Amino acid sequence: MLYQAIYVDPGAVAIRYPRGGEPTPPDGYQYEKEPFRIFGDPGAKRCLVTYGRLFDTCLQAIGELDDTFVIKLNRIRPIAPEAVAAAAKAQGIWFYEEATVSGGVGQTLAALLEEKGTSARFFHKAVPDTFVKHASVDSQLRKFGLDKASIVSEVNHAEENPA
């Protein structure tokens, strides 16, 4: 990504280095400059969409969830239309981001899914628009439901309690 930011993209590029570092990528993972990548069966009925550090967490979560796949966004603006189309095929879509709810990438995806006319249920989990006190990364992820256990619980709970 840094190479592309310096030598390829002509405009401004933001690179985020999260506090606490990045987790180890899964075996066989290689960044291939595509705007997104699908992990798991894209025909599954549930889809987790994320980017950044939470990708590893979501990937771990699908190990405990049935019939679920992950879309990892490598580029968050603009969201690739193919990523929107892939998510729209699922019956339930959960977007997890380590950013604020308002103006976040999840809101953008929700708008794009609405424009597409998807009938899938959409859930957006992010940090509320409030002051976040200093604490360890792990405790904050738990507090805001962005850890593996919370993700697994939320997805399973939604399945048990359909709208």
For every predicted segment, state its role:
Residues M1-I6:
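Internal gly/pro-rich beta-alpha loop/helix module
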Residues Y7-A163:
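Thiamine diphosphate
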